[in-house]
Amino acid sequence: GQSAQLFEKAFLAYQKVYEQFPDSGRVGDAVAKMAAFYYQKEDYSRAIDVFENVLSDHPDANFLDVILFNYGRCLYKLKRKPEARKRFEQLINDYPESEIASEANKIVKALKKAGF
C-alpha cells in the first residue's frame, strides 16, 4: 500500500545518508532505520548484516544501544538465542544508563532461565 511505498522511500533516503556520510555520527540513526525496515519485513538476516556492519565499521555511531537491542531481537527471531543473549548483555554492559538496558536485562534473565 501507500505506507509501504513511503517506507521504501524513507529506507532509500537513509541508505543514501549511510553511503554518503559513512563517518558521520548520523550513521547510527540511518542504520537503525534501515534495520527497522528489514525487521518490519521479517528479513532478519539482512537486518543482522546491517547491524554487524555498523558494529564493526562504526563503533562510535549514535544509537548503538538501540542497534544492539534490535540486533538481539533479530537473532532471537532466528532462534539464535545464545547469540541474542550476548548482544543483550553487551548492551547492558556498554550502556547501563540506557532506557532499554532494563528491558534487555529482563530478556537476559528469561533466556538464562530457559537455559540459553
Please describe what each predicted stretch is.
Residues 1-116:
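Acidic, polar-rich low-complexity tracts and alpha-helical solenoid repeat scaffolds
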